[in-house]
């Protein structure tokens, strides 16, 4: 079925159990879908925009209150909605990083952190991960010391992923921010895989900035996200424009420079708002989500030769798995080669594993029911057994 000329309707979530690593937390709630239809027109939320003419002041729909609620929920002082987590990184880097500045990221950082630093003219420098694929406070301290020695200046910013995208490991952010603050380095916590998925307390983490992704982890349309900060940094990162036209003398009120005035002017912000009550509730059930993740991982580990590369026992729903000694051995002899796995999963109503992947790959079980979790685990085992792999 087509939803428009040459555009096929998407039915992934309706027809399959989706374990795609980046899509699980962004499934819209029913309320968000209804809001998306109602506010689909471009500048739809601007119907009742009145002086001082800025998104976070709009009362109807209650966008102003939503901003306050976001900040309180994250235990931060101020928040803004942004077009994806990457725009949060960009806003902070643009504010704090000057040309030639060394900026601390990690060897597990998302590429958008590098790009944000690069765009600001900074030089991204990585804290190495340890043998367990973790970023440690000691490694952060060593890197900071080395950077100060090399550049004769203190880095203006440190990025740390709360949960990294490569392994889905939860890092000791509070300890790392404590180290950074000993050098007076502000810390941006990338919560793209945690905000909206699991409980996040920005001040308990010691964060100067918490960035979340609406479309990755808050059941919101893309592109959407949140940038939250403390009173110490709000005035600087959310500074208002001082520009003035030299011919017209025009000024632009309280438009914020890093937000380019306003950010999410329609379906994205209202979708976030509509899902927010559900998102606040679902993070309270994080233990159940982790148990579900563990159940699928254990099913995979029952297949001889399979290894989990993420932390074990699991502490998150995003997992990196190594099946080079199991499913990939089948792929070498199978007529479909590596595509047999995604094909066999699809026959069982499961999607999200990249077609052709039988070596090292990721999946995400977030949001699945107990019954769906059981089906996913059993399906992996059945496929293994049907293809001659041993179950231990």
Swiss-Prot record:
What does the record give as cofactor? Answer: pyridoxal 5'-phosphate
Q: Which of the seven top EC classes does this enzyme belong to?
A: transferase
List-wise, which residues carry N6-(pyridoxal phosphate)lysine? 216
Keywords attached to this entry: Protein biosynthesis, Pyridoxal phosphate, Transferase
Gene3D superfamilies listed in its UniProt record: Aspartate Aminotransferase, domain 1, Type I PLP-dependent aspartate aminotransferase-like (Major domain)
Q: Provide the GO MF annotations for this entry.
A: Sep-tRNA:Cys-tRNA synthase activity
Q: Which residues are involved in binding pyridoxal 5'-phosphate?
A: 85-86, 190, 213-215
Please give the Pfam families that the UniProt record associates with this protein: Aminotran_5 (PF00266)
Q: What is its EC number?
A: 2.5.1.73
The record ties this protein, via SUPFAM superfamilies, to: PLP-dependent transferases
**How is this protein organized at the quaternary level?**
Homodimer. Interacts with SepRS.
Its biological purpose is as follows: Converts O-phospho-L-seryl-tRNA(Cys) (Sep-tRNA(Cys)) to L-cysteinyl-tRNA(Cys) (Cys-tRNA(Cys)).
The entry assigns this protein to a family as follows:
Belongs to the SepCysS family.
* Protein name per the record: O-phospho-L-seryl-tRNA:Cys-tRNA synthase
In its UniProt entry, the species of origin is given as Methanoculleus marisnigri (strain ATCC 35101 / DSM 1498 / JR1)
Organism phylogeny: Archaea, Methanobacteriati, Methanobacteriota, Stenosarchaea group, Methanomicrobia
């Amino acid at each position: 079925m087509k939803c428009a000329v040459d555009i096929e309707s998407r039915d992934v979530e309706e027809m399959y159990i989706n374990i795609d690593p980046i899509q699980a937390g962004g499934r819209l709630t029913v309320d968000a879908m209804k809001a998306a239809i109602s506010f689909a027109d471009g500048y739809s939320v601007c119907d009742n925009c009145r002086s001082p003419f800025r998104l976070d002041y709009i009362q109807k729909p209650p966008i102003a209150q939503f901003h306050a609620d976001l900040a309180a929920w994250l235990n931060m002082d101020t928040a803004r909605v942004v077009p994806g987590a990457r725009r949060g990184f960009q806003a902070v880097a643009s504010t704090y990083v000057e040309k030639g500045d060394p900026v601390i990221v990690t060897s597990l950082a998302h590429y958008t952190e590098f790009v944000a630093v690069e765009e600001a003219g900074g030089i991204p420098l990585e804290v190495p991960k340890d043998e367990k694929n973790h970023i440690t406070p000691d490694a952060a301290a060593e890197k900071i010391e080395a950077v100060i020695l090399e550049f004769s200046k203190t880095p203006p910013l440190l990025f740390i992923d709360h949960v990294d995208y490569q392994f889905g490991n939860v890092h000791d952010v509070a300890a790392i921010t404590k180290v950074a603050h000993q050098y007076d380095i502000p810390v941006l916590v990338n919560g793209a895989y945690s905000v909206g998925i699991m409980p996040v307390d920005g001040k308990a983490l010691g964060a100067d900035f918490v960035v979340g992704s609406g479309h990755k982890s808050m059941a919101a349309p893309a592109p959407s996200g949140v940038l939250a900060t403390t009173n110490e940094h709000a005035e600087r990162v959310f500074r208002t424009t001082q520009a003035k036209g030299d011919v017209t003398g025009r000024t632009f009120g309280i438009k914020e420079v890093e937000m380019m005035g306003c950010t999410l002017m329609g379906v994205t912000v209202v979708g976030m708002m509509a899902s927010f009550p559900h998102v606040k509730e679902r993070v309270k059930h994080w233990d159940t989500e982790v148990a579900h993740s563990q159940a699928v991982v254990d099913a995979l580990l029952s297949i001889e030769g399979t290894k989990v590369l993420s932390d074990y026992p699991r502490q998150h729903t995003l997992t990196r798995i190594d099946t080079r000694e199991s499913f990939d051995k089948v792929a070498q002899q199978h007529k479909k080669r590596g595509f047999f796995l995604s094909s066999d999963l699809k026959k069982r109503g499961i999607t999200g594993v990249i077609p052709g992947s039988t070596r090292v790959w990721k999946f995400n079980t977030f949001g699945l029911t107990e019954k769906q979790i059981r089906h996913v685990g059993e399906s992996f085992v059945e496929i293994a057994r049907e293809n001659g792999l041993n179950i231990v």
